[in-house]
Amino acid sequence: MTAPLNPSAPITVEVALGDRGYDIVIGRGGIESLGRRITALRPGARTAIVTDRSVAKHWLPRAQASLDETGIAHSTIVVEEGEVSKSYAGLQQVCEALIEAKIERNDLVIALGGGVVGDLAGFASSIVRRGLDFVQVPTSLLAQVDSSVGGKTGINSPHGKNLVGAFHQPVLVIADTAVLDTLSPRQFRAGYAEVVKYGALGDSGFFAWLEANHAEIVRGGAAREHAIATSCRAKAGVVARDERETGERALLNLGHTFGHALEAATGFSDRLFHGEGVAIGMVLAAEFSAERGMMPAQDATRLSHHLTAAGLPTRMQDIAGFKQEGLADADSLMALMAQDKKVKRGRLTFILMEAIGRAVIANDVEPAPVRDFLHRKLAES
């Protein structure tokens, strides 16, 4: 691993997609630079800020002030906080508001918020006037290291998570690390699961660094910015090689097949944050891999131990209300996984593991062993 980067200067990570490439700018004070960066990127553009009620209280005034200082016209669209907005109704609200604001194809949409806002605003941008450019200003750790990068946008369906959407790359990502200071501990932990994912799937050295430096990452400063930049570089590299997820990019879904099914089973509610579902999903994927003889059992245990040490759930029994409200049975979870975006010709595709730092795409997994595995895991005390 390289030494942590100097937090006093912004870190720039390039997403190399030719004429559709863009920069991820990481560092404190990014929101204050929003107006200046947009002026340089798109002189004369008007903007529409899409945000949620919670983010609006903390960060909308700073974003608006930055735009005002550079004379950029702006309107604001505020949606409800949480997955409830990542819906057909939420999409209609944002699309109609963009049309009413007369945002044109030479203007910019600004997604100021976490993963829900970024996915929603990005998808609306992809379809209004057959395509508006947008800027991601992610305000959660999860969004900064994952959902704001790579162009996946969309909403949920009653049938499952992220089933309606489009690939639509942003033109700029501004990851202001100062906003992370206002996250609740639970929100920060949920985002940290996605950071761990990058080490687990492709960088054993980064995983070991996370084990040694987790406390420093929580405290902030150079270690936190290094973790974010390393995660963004990992994702940017994969996206540049496989933008449309025809191969390698599927590895970034480690933990997501199980995790998305658990999110759907809990009604996309606050019982289980997305990152928490990914944490449980990664452990399930690792343990299933170990049972198949693909991965040393001690590596699966090591992954589980680090996530537990970070305060994340690692078992389905850790989901809020599991004992009182229960959870879907194995057959119901299998039905939810059958709606996964990675299903091809009706066959499940899993991201499994051979070791810490080495994930693989498995297209040959029969449903019966997965169902039996889930049944046993659900029955654990």
From Swiss-Prot:
Alphabetical GO biological process terms: amino acid biosynthetic process; aromatic amino acid family biosynthetic process; chorismate biosynthetic process
Enzyme Commission number(s) from the entry: 4.2.3.4
InterPro entries referenced in this protein's UniProt entry, alphabetically: Dehydroquinate_synthase (IPR050071), DHQ_synth_AroB (IPR016037), DHQ_synth_fam (IPR030963), DHQS/DOIS_N (IPR030960), DHQS_C (IPR056179)
Record GO terms (molecular function): 3-dehydroquinate synthase activity; metal ion binding; nucleotide binding
Domain of life: Bacteria
Residues annotated for NAD(+) binding in this entry: 81-86, 115-119, 139-140, 152, 161
Free-text cofactor note: Binds 1 divalent metal cation per subunit. Can use either Co(2+) or Zn(2+).
Keywords assigned: Amino-acid biosynthesis, Aromatic amino acid biosynthesis, Cobalt, Cytoplasm, Lyase, Metal-binding, NAD, Nucleotide-binding, Zinc
Record field: catalytic activity: 7-phospho-2-dehydro-3-deoxy-D-arabino-heptonate = 3-dehydroquinate + phosphate
Compartment(s) where it occurs, according to its Swiss-Prot or TrEMBL record: Cytoplasm
Matching Pfam families: DHQ_synthase, DHQS_C
Entry GO CC: cytoplasm
Pathway this chain belongs to: Metabolic intermediate biosynthesis; chorismate biosynthesis; chorismate from D-erythrose 4-phosphate and phosphoenolpyruvate: step 2/7
Annotated binding of Zn(2+), by residue: E194, H256, H274
Cofactor: Co(2+); Zn(2+); NAD(+)
HAMAP family to which the protein is assigned, alphabetical: DHQ_synthase
Function, as annotated: Catalyzes the conversion of 3-deoxy-D-arabino-heptulosonate 7-phosphate (DAHP) to dehydroquinate (DHQ).
Family note: Belongs to the sugar phosphate cyclases superfamily. Dehydroquinate synthase family.
Descriptive protein name: 3-dehydroquinate synthase
Upper lineage: Bacteria, Pseudomonadati, Pseudomonadota, Alphaproteobacteria, Hyphomicrobiales
The gene coding this protein: aroB
